[in-house]
């Protein structure tokens, strides 16, 4: 019999379901960087990918299992369809992890059975039972999901779950695959499972939901009240279509309203024990990392991690907050790792002070990474006399967490004005080490720079998104540029930061082109292998 956990288990699927968001494609090193940060955040399980989907996915899951899947670290999980080859690939990928999980699934709604699977109900039950048992032959930790459970016939759903648990599933995950249910409906589904699946006490009930109607977090909280003890979520709520339930919103909702949720977990209302293992002070840093690497910007009014989450415009609100924060703030910004943005370093600060402050902010850099970041810090400090924690974060993210360095910006010069045609000259270092220079005229300085870069790189693409944000206030603030471009049906993102937004724009564009170029090279190699 499985012992019910004392805390809510946080299952992070940013690297699997979150990466399915258009344009959020990550390379292996970026996935590893996020996995390491998720471990620092304190998630219980990392769904590292879908091992059978591609060689790249397999390698990413395997590398994360090797590096992050330590005895004291999170469980490393791979998704697998209810098929022998999928499950075998998942088992091989998670093998290096001290604690590994296989998550297998098959659809159970009539619409999926009829049109997608073309299977009968008895056939689906038999497949679920067989594949869970097969997964169990590789690991004791097996999760089973009845896809589209929210639209499945309850009686059939109960039968499938009972047989899956009997075959060895230790976690039963209930997905609202298309984000269709309302909180009361979703809570009723979980309650029905608790009451009608005879062996449900042998498994943990998990939930997975999408945000198509904006109800994912509300559905999950209702599920907790009805017996769910594992929540499958993503950082910033990224994912397919309208995204997934946001980890930061779920965790902070239960943290701030702990007295409300305590009784549903059999605790005294006034218990101060945390409901999850999450280190909330790592939330903001994790949010920024995922946003920077995926190119998925966080909307300013996003709960918990949005730029305006702790901002007050109304004079009445401002007056109240100045007198006592609790008048209009239900949580302290420092709870999620936001600092008061104190000025800590300047151009006279040395390497030791730089290293020490980065450690205090939670950055763990190798000596090579530290050297690169310190050089960039000195460059910024010469232009910007006051360096804040947010500036340091932008410097580290920009210098260390970048796309493969295939093309590199060596020079950017622009000429523009009210009576001049914007002209740009750029010099790029190619993957072969050659320096190429070209120039172009555009509708503005950024357009001219991008046209000049395209003349050098010569990879057809369409720019579909361009965004500039300042890291801090002030005329000398670092500007962060995020761009997304499309090549055929795929979307690639780029991110860069600089006190000169034209330079940042060039670097962000080249970062996105590097991702595109690396992808084309990988395709060519795979074509050669299969030819």
From Swiss-Prot:
UniProt domain Pyruvate carboxyltransferase: residue ranges: 8-284
Keywords: Amino-acid biosynthesis, Branched-chain amino acid biosynthesis, Cytoplasm, Leucine biosynthesis, Manganese, Metal-binding, Transferase
UniProt enzyme class: transferase
Domain of life: Bacteria
GO molecular function, one term: manganese ion binding
Subcellular location, record wording: Cytoplasm
Residues that bind Mn(2+): 17, 208, 210, 244
Chain's role: Catalyzes the condensation of the acetyl group of acetyl-CoA with 3-methyl-2-oxobutanoate (2-ketoisovalerate) to form 3-carboxy-3-hydroxy-4-methylpentanoate (2-isopropylmalate).
Subunit (UniProt): Homodimer.
Name of the featured protein: 2-isopropylmalate synthase
């Amino acid at each position: 019999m499985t012992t019910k956990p004392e805390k809510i288990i946080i299952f992070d699927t940013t690297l699997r379901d979150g990466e399915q968001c258009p344009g959020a494609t990550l390379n292996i090193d970026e996935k590893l960087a996020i996995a390491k940060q998720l471990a620092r955040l304190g998630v219980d399980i990392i769904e590292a990918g879908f091992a059978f989907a591609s060689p790249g996915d397999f390698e990413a899951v395997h590398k994360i299992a090797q590096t992050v899947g330590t005895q004291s670290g999170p469980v490393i999980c791979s998704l697998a369809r209810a098929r022998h080859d999928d499950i075998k690939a998942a088992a091989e990928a998670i093998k290096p992890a001290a604690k590994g999980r296989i998550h297998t699934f098959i659809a159970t709604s009539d619409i999926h059975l009829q049109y997608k699977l073309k299977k009968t109900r008895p056939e689906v039950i038999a497949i679920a039972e067989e594949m869970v048992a097969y997964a169990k032959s590789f690991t004791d930790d097996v999760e089973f999901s009845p896809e589209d459970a929210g639209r499945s016939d309850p009686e059939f759903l109960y039968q499938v779950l009972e047989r899956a648990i009997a075959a060895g599933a230790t976690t039963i995950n209930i997905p609202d695959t298309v984000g269709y249910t309302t909180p009361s409906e979703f809570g009723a589904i979980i309650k029905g499972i608790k009451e009608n699946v005879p062996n449900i006490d042998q498994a943990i009930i998990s939930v997975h939901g999408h945000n198509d109607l904006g109800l994912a977090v509300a559905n999950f909280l209702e599920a907790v009240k009805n017996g769910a003890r594992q929540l499958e979520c993503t950082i910033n709520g990224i994912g397919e279509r309208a995204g997934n339930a946001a980890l930061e919103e779920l965790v902070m909702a239960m943290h701030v309203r702990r007295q409300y949720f305590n009784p549903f977990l059999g605790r005294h209302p006034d218990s101060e024990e945390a409901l999850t293992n999450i280190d909330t002070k790592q939330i903001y840093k994790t949010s920024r990392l995922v946003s920077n690497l995926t190119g998925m910007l966080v909307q300013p009014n996003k709960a918990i991690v949005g730029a305006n989450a702790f901002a007050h415009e109304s004079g009445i609100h401002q007056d109240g907050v100045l007198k006592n924060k609790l008048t209009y703030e239900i949580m302290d910004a420092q709870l999620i790792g936001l600092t008061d943005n104190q000025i800590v370093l300047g151009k006279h600060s040395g390497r030791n002070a730089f290293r020490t402050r980065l450690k205090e902010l939670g950055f763990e850099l190798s000596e090579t990474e530290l050297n690169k970041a310190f050089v960039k810090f000195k460059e910024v400090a010469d232009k910007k006399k006051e360096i804040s924690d947010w500036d340091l974060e932008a410097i580290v993210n920009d210098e260390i967490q970048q796309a493969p360095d295939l093309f590199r910006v060596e020079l950017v010069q622009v000429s523009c004005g009210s009576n001049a045609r914007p002209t740009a000259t750029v010099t790029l270092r190619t993957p072969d080490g050659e320096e190429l220079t070209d120039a172009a005229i555009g509708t503005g300085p950024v357009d001219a720079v991008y046209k000049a870069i395209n003349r050098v790189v010569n990879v057809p693409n369409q720019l579909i998104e361009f965004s500039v944000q300042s890291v801090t206030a002030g005329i000398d603030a670092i500007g962060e540029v995020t761009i997304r471009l499309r090549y055929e049906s795929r979307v690639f993102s780029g991110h860069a930061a600089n006190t000169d937004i034209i330079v940042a724009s060039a670097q962000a564009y080249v970062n996105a082109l590097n991702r595109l170029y690396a992808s084309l090279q990988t395709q060519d190699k795979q074509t050669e292998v299969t030819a």
